[in-house]
């Protein structure tokens, strides 16, 4: 189901969509407005939007820091004032939420134990999905082979230009296939890097789905790269915050 200002989708298990007794994932669009989140800031627009999407569930979030930190929780209060980039849970009354603006939202569901969650995965956090799955195995007794993974809309290698040092890092630590070179420039596929990491971990290939939509190409998404492209290069990230649209991404029963 899609709305005017958000999209939703299903998980896939052995290549088949899960419907009925399964959660779905969702992501706000640029038209929904800025969904940025910090513990010391009030964002009434975000609160109203997520309250409507939650339909009675409790929204749980962490302040993002581009890390590999994932929390396994059973209540909203466990996350108070915490920073990190992922939330997993078995509690169907919770709706884990992260924010993205070109970075990859990753949605998880393990149908055997009912574990689900949401992750924020930029280039620094590439591989956080593996950390989350291992944490779910340790905490909830999950099996990595049962995990369904959806990589949501994010900046693709058509637009994600990186420097040579970062290109080499990804070639060595993930797979050479995740970097392409064109006219002396390097472009990164976050999808290829994360898929490689998941397959190496033992997640089934036909349980992995990746969105084909590039947030930098498509005007319906907020995009740090696209929306800040014309700003002075010496402007700080904090100053740039007002110029790009942060989106919310969630999983909900």
Residue ranges of model-derived segments:
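Active-site microenvironment for binding and transforming phosphate-containing groups
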Residues: 1-253
């Amino acid at each position: 189901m899609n709305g005017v200002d958000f999209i939703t989708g299903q998980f896939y298990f052995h290549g088949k969509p899960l419907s009925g007794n399964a959660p779905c994932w969702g992501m706000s669009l640029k038209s929904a407005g800025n969904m940025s989140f910090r513990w010391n800031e009030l964002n009434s627009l975000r609160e109203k939007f997520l309250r409507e999407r939650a339909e009675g569930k409790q929204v749980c979030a962490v302040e993002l820091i581009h890390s590999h930190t994932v929390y396994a929780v059973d209540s909203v209060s466990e996350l108070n004032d915490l920073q990190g980039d992922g939330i997993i849970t078995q509690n169907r009354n919770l709706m884990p939420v992260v924010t993205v603006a070109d970075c990859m939202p990753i949605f998880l569901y393990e149908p055997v134990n009912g574990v689900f969650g949401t992750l924020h995965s930029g280039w620094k956090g590439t591989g956080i999905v593996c950390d989350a799955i291992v944490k779910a195995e340790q905490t909830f007794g999950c099996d990595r082979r049962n995990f369904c993974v959806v990589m949501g809309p994010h900046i693709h290698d058509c637009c994600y230009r990186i420097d040579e040092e970062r290109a080499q890092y990804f070639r060595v630590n993930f797979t050479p296939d995740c970097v392409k070179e064109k006219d002396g420039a390097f472009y990164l596929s976050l999808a290829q890097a994360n898929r490689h990491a998941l397959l190496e971990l033992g997640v089934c290939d036909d349980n992995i789905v990746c969105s084909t939509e590039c947030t930098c190409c498509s005007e319906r998404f907020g995009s740090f790269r696209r929306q800040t492209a014309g700003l002075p290069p010496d402007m700080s990230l904090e100053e740039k915050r007002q110029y790009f649209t942060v989106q919310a991404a969630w999983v909900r029963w």
